[in-house]
Amino acid sequence: MDNTYNPQEVEEQAQQYWHKKQSFNVTEDLNKEKFYCLSMFPYPSGTLHMGHVRNYTLGDVIARYQRALGKNVLQPIGWDAFGLPAENAAIKNKIPPAEWTRKNIAAMKEQFLRLGNAYDWKRELTTCDPEYYRWEQWFFIRLFEKGLVYKKNAVVNWDPVDQTVLANEQVVDGRGWRSGALVERKEISQWFIKITSYADELLSSLDSLDEWPAQVKQMQRNWIGKSIGTEIYFNVNNYPKRLKIYTTRPDTLMGATYLAVATDHPLAKEAASNNKKVQEFLDSCQGIKIAEAELATMEKRGIDTGMTAIHPITGKELPIWVANFVLMQYGSGAVMAVPAHDQRDWEFAQKYQLPVKQVIKPIDIEHDFNQSAYTEEGILINSNQFDNLLSSKAIQVITNFLEENDAGKATINYRLRDWGVSRQRYWGTPIPMIICEQCGIVPVPDEELPVVLPENVDFTGTGSPLTQCKEFVNVTCPKCGQDATRETDTFDTFVESSWYYARFACKGQENAMLDDRAKYWTPVDQYIGGIEHAVMHLLYARFFHKLMRDEGLVNSDEPFKALLTQGMVLKDGHKMSKSLGNVVDPNHLINTYGADTARLFVMFASPPEQSLEWSDSGVEGAHRFLKRVWAFSHQHRDMLIDINDSILSGNGHVDWKEAESRLKKSRHIVHQILAQATHDYDRNQFNTVVSGCMKLFNEISDYSIETENDKFFIHSSISILLRLLAPITPHICHCLWQQLGFDKAIIDAPWPKVDKSALKTDEVDYVVQVNGKLRAQFTASTDATEEELIAAAKEHAHNFVVNHTIKKAIIVPHRQLINLVIG
């Protein structure tokens, strides 16, 4: 055992042991409590960054701790391998996306191995492998057969240069992020999955997720956006269809002075067909992508269509406007405007000099309608038969009136829209559908799955390469045998990441999407990832789990029992990025200090949920601590080996009750730290675990070894320390555990038990304050009387109370504090 801590040698030795013993490969065991720990799998970008190191170390620490508790732990790893970066790399570097992806996976896997994470590598999966996405295609067809999948025209962001759909995030200042072209709003045919059919369950089952952050659950509630309101029907002059609008405030219906529709609403297009000015307005809105978050601050613009609607109660005509603040994707794409009681409608009315009709009277306050809208509830006025009703009552009465007159109905509305899964890209899972002129849409037969991406394609950067690949596109209809074409869209990559956690449980299953192993392992007991995934990925995964449940593939309602959302890694107060020049390279860190130092620092520097501020001095401090632990263990190696031999031979019993006072006191501290650290591990508060380990080490390194009992105490304490540190710094703990003669490998050692008798103490440390200021401290017996404690306090604080009158002595037992109040 070398006196000098060499992390590279230590870590190589530990990793070779784990690899040789297949230490982290796991199978189902009904005799053990299972624990499935999973960090969100990475996109293979080519290199790990410090955010990765923090995220995956968190998961590994949790998995190793749960294993030490005796549970059957699964911790897999894989690759979210489809996506736009690989396709862009293919265009730029003239290499196939698959080649670029495989190269990146190999590089990142090497980095993961160096970190020492306890992964079951036999379960490794890659979403771009046909054996993975085959079952995604199979499941999509099952959903199609159930009516949960459909294809329809939808308005999208279209890049006319790249000839592809862009996500909202890829539109920068109205231009395509790559081509720089002005983005158009274009209607094309898209595939959708009916997530709205599960909206109510997705919302209600959030209440069962007790171990999810409240913030994430609220974000999902807001995204689903359930509201109870009224659907109102307006007849339109010279137009065949009624205009449907949704409102949560039917009590303001009598104050509606105009209607507004979205720029891509069918009625707007109808008006534009014979009104040049309306068409010009629609054209001016074509390249503008309006995000919902921008509605409050953007300039409100519109134009009168010249068409009118009939108020369902008064029969009066209301002008219909096209407005840029009405979005087709929310509600029905039409709103009734009540300027007196909606601020957005009021601003629009002021700009275009439209009428403002007050129909709600504030209760006990005055309001100036020339300055703003009044948006709260009140008493109805100017509302004919509904006058003098409170808003709460009027909502019900007016809704009933509309229902009785076939002019509306009570309804529940959701902000959530069906999930559009089509992407006009190559590097994704092919959608397994065939389009036949005679038969329509026909699923690819199961026996022909997977539909594999062709390799003989050209990456020009314009349009989808699949559309130009005749061998891929031209097929025979499986239903009628006539010539047909294959669907050339690929899946949104969120589809792959919505079910991968379940496939990890069934790796190697070639004949089914999932098997009974998925029912054993799911739900995931602990899921770890960034809060930026709160809505999209986490919502889609919850949805997919319910779809798989209803197909009989899993038997739980939710995919992830507990969720930990880690904070970002910052340097100089900013997120690490190449452009800011504040990136820390994990490879350099591991080469210099070792993986254990990197792991220790990222666990110690901050609670998991908070941002971590990088500190070079903090890294050096973590490394110094590990060197001290190594040196101390080396210094006492022979003694510790002898004690181990005594214990293994049955001669290592110590009666701690008969030990001397100083040993009892130190042992009390060690077991106090053990109890607190175990509690902190259970709450994922690893920074305080590390702090406790440092206190424990200081206690034993300062302890004077004088008796045989002292040796057993040091042995017991180092055993506890190494097991407390092992989930966080597994390599050094593995080597020290073996070299100090402990039984088994430390990964198979049970979690240390708190000796409750050690927590009991004969003595208590008290601090003495004089007029609230700390002046002294002393040790007293646990059964000391109040009089004895006060006398001891006076004695130890003598210099501060002499020549003063002690007016009062206050004892605070739970804080072990005595405050002497002097005059």
Swiss-Prot record:
> Which InterPro entries does this one have?
aa-tRNA-synth_I_CS (IPR001412), aa-tRNA-synth_Ia (IPR002300), Leu-tRNA-ligase (IPR002302), Leu_tRNA-synth_edit (IPR025709), M/V/L/I-tRNA-synth_anticd-bd (IPR013155), Methionyl/Leucyl_tRNA_Synth (IPR015413), Rossmann-like_a/b/a_fold (IPR014729), tRNAsynth_Ia_anticodon-bd (IPR009080)
Main subcellular location: cytoplasm
Is Flavoprotein one of the keywords UniProt gives this record?
Answer: no
- Gene Ontology process terms (BP): leucyl-tRNA aminoacylation
Top-level EC class as recorded in UniProt? ligase
Tell me where in or outside the cell this protein is found.
Cytoplasm
The GO terms describing molecular function are: aminoacyl-tRNA deacylase activity; ATP binding; leucine-tRNA ligase activity
Protein's name according to its UniProt entry = Leucine--tRNA ligase
